[in-house]
Amino acid sequence: MAFQPTPLRVALVAGEPSGDLLGASLLGGLHAQLPASSRYYGIGGPRMTAVDFDAHWPMEKLAVRGYVEALKHIPEILRIRGELKRQLLAEPPDAFIGIDAPDFNFGLEQALRGAGIPTVHFVCPSIWAWRGGRIKKIVKAVDHMLCLFPFEPELLEKAGVAATFVGHPLADEIPLEPDMHGARIALGLPDSGPVIAVLPGSRRSEIELIGPTFFDAMALMQQREPGVRFVVPAATPALRELLQPLVDAHPLLSVTLTEGRAQVAMTAADAILVKSGTVTLEAALLKKPMVISYKVPWLTGQIMRRQGYLPYVGLPNILAGRFVVPELLQHFATPEALADATLTQLRDDANRRTLTGIFTDMHLALRQNTAQRAAEAVARVIDSRKPH
């Protein structure tokens, strides 16, 4: 890149843990691609701040899920967005990168783009799955979209939005053949015997809704498969405290409750019961049979159902274009149904071999050196705006 008389300034906003992961990966690529004097600032989490990012607000202020649940947080979120917009318009960065969080970022990006600031959005919203009307917002707000999945650029380019498929950083990070033995040693689990990882979500509201159902399902599974062990990773210390009463309420369960280490827990497992989200892709990259589930409040569920297009919600099924693992959602997510489906995934060796092949192909398709590709695309956007 040509010499810069003043340091480049790149503003970024990530709104939840998955965005923090993507942001940290992208920052690693930007540090290698852009001049060493470049500054990176905005809103991010601990992973981003660990790689020379100046967080003006903590990411947790934006990490609110669902329509109804977000209502009480709207005033503070709008205040933060207004303050950030004023800052960025007063001192324009060389580029703005919104990382996921479309409900927060698109309005901000539209205002910045209108002022001539280049806008990049990292993670295409699921316009192919639901809320397809957001393509109109993307056209107004985004100069360039960085896409995690290979089918997305074509959809965007048809609407006139420049886009680059960059792959997924998890596919770069996770080995093609995960080390189950090492993961079990790390967790103090025996090398033999069935292990099921149970992941009821990374937010308090998710765990409160589905956690009791998951633990009731675990109790049923242990009755039917007496040698089974469970490992439940809690994303934060606060969530561990929330999960501990569920463990205490099932004293006969053979369960290991860990803090963090979700990937280690899934690597150690023979099968996974998981709440829908990015973690389902992680489970697929680890080549694990799984059952995907979620429960949301009734009104949120009704809104989502009316705006949905695809018959599935789990990323492994979306990427495969068909059901390759079962999904049990809302009122279908009973302890009995979850236990039956998870034990089937645990015991069916032929299905395990089939899934290993499907998930290996998926892994190879998404392994694209995401940090470098994304950073190169950002550098091109910045370079295209400089006077030549």
Curated annotation (Swiss-Prot):
Enzyme Commission number: 2.4.1.182
One Pfam short name: LpxB
Similarity annotation: Belongs to the LpxB family.
InterPro entries associated with the record: Glyco_trans_19 (IPR003835)
Pathway(s) of this molecule: Bacterial outer membrane biogenesis; LPS lipid A biosynthesis
Identification of the protein by name: Lipid-A-disaccharide synthase
One Gene Ontology cellular component annotation held by this UniProt entry: membrane
Keyword Disulfide bond: no
Lineage: Bacteria, Pseudomonadati, Pseudomonadota, Betaproteobacteria, Burkholderiales
Classification via PANTHER family: LIPID-A-DISACCHARIDE SYNTHASE, LIPID-A-DISACCHARIDE SYNTHASE, MITOCHONDRIAL-RELATED
GO biological process assignments: lipid A biosynthetic process
Record's catalysed reaction(s): a lipid X + a UDP-2-N,3-O-bis[(3R)-3-hydroxyacyl]-alpha-D-glucosamine = a lipid A disaccharide + UDP + H(+)
